[in-house]
Amino acid sequence: MAGKNVEKRDNQTLCCSFCGKSQKEVKKLIAGPTVYICDECIGLCNDIIAEEIDREETKDTKLRIPRPSEIKAVLDEYVIGQERAKKTLSVAVHNHYKRIESKVAMEDVELQKSNILLLGPTGSGKTLLAQTLARILNVPFTIADATCLTEAGYVGEDVENIIVNLLQAADHDIERAQRGIVYIDEIDKIARKSENPSITRDVSGEGVQQALLKLIEGTVANVPPKGGRKHPQQEFLQVDTTNILFICGGAFGGLDQVIERRMGGRSLGFGADVQSKKQRSLTELLKHVEPEDLLKFGMIPEFIGRLPIITALEELDEAALINILNQPKNALTKQYRKLFELDGVTLKFTDGALKAIANEAIRRKAGARGLRSILESAMLDVMYEIPSRKTAREVLISEEVILKKSEPVVLHAQPEKEAAEPKKESA
């Protein structure tokens, strides 16, 4: 009888006790007392256990707060120049997370959050600074575009969607999200249209500033789990923004004129006016920004008060842009050299080529952000051809390639025709 039972069992199609898949649908089926489990379910169990362990470790591990000098040292690896801005950010971020991690009861002193406002022209490194800070601290990070935000109830993105995006960056871990960093770009674009309050509704300007106030200062935001608009039947996640660091950035075009008027730059006399403009560059003027200047620009007083740390980034000159091309860990020339190296080709740039790239970026007023598009345009053809040129060993990018769209010099191990002849004979 026992033998017959075994034979009957062998003839049966066995199935996984967890997912129900048959032994024919999976790679392995492991038998236990009265149960079976397939390789797919084992893999899923391993993933669940690993995720739980990681989450517990994240909760138990106290955030290590780097010293300001350590933060700046890492910023130096990715951001060229902007020394004062990097020092200011390093101190502000260190103090912010020290405030969060402090377990000492401070009944007599309340440490307030210090959000940051970055002023500077396009391509000066505002976004890169914020991204690098988040990487140093290993905290969730998200970027929001202020021009897409509108007041609640109007077409556009609600300000709460910023927190939804941060929550997604934290893999929906609310505790991690509540220690994250939010960078709001183009903040100058939500300035109200005039210095005086208007009776008409400004849903994408002053209205957005008002909506951002509580979020930046610290509030418990009710956010929909999957983003989008709120509706009454929906369940909400509660996220406390008290310990989220908000960094706002913008070019603030025209703010220099406001500062210059306050400082008496437009003094009487034609000659005095010209002299003041020569002496005071945009960078120099932005260094002297005061809250009253931002008020005249169109930011509301309450919003300015939520961003106590204001730092200006410098305009990037030719030397700075050349250094950006060469020095950082993620320098563009290093990236392109690595791409060519994967095809067995050495890529070289002449000094004239680097100067031409930097000057073209200055001419376009694109700053460091414009460097990649200039390089891509100049090198498109050679990047298209090199993978097909098996004998190519070296590519030289000269000034003429950038300015006159000339062909780069390509050196071969042997003439291409000679390399192709043996193939013809063998054929």
From Swiss-Prot:
Record-listed ATP binding positions: 121-128
Keyword Heme: no
GO molecular function: ATP binding; ATP hydrolysis activity; ATP-dependent protein folding chaperone; protein dimerization activity; unfolded protein binding; zinc ion binding
PROSITE patterns associated with the record: CLPX_ZB
Sequence intervals crossing the membrane: none
Keywords, comma-separated and alphabetical: ATP-binding, Chaperone, Metal-binding, Nucleotide-binding, Zinc
Pfam families: AAA_2 (PF07724), ClpB_D2-small (PF10431), zf-C4_ClpX (PF06689)
Record-listed Zn(2+) binding positions: 16, 19, 38, 41
GO CC terms, sorted: HslUV protease complex
GO terms under biological process: cell division; proteolysis involved in protein catabolic process
InterPro entries referenced in this protein's UniProt entry, alphabetically: AAA+_ATPase, ATP-dep_Clp_protease_ClpX, ATPase_AAA_core, Clp_ATPase_C, Clp_protease_ATP-bd_su_ClpX, ClpX_bact, P-loop_NTPase, Znf_CppX_C4
Alphabetized PANTHER family for the sequence: ATP-DEPENDENT CLP PROTEASE ATP-BINDING SUBUNIT CLPX-LIKE, MITOCHONDRIAL (PTHR48102:SF7), ATP-DEPENDENT CLP PROTEASE ATP-BINDING SUBUNIT CLPX-LIKE, MITOCHONDRIAL-RELATED (PTHR48102)
Free-text function comment from the UniProt entry: ATP-dependent specificity component of the Clp protease. It directs the protease to specific substrates. Can perform chaperone functions in the absence of ClpP.
Subunit structure: Component of the ClpX-ClpP complex. Forms a hexameric ring that, in the presence of ATP, binds to fourteen ClpP subunits assembled into a disk-like structure with a central cavity, resembling the structure of eukaryotic proteasomes.
Protein family (similarity comment): Belongs to the ClpX chaperone family.
Name used for this protein in its record: ATP-dependent Clp protease ATP-binding subunit ClpX
Organism: Myxococcus xanthus
The encoding gene: clpX
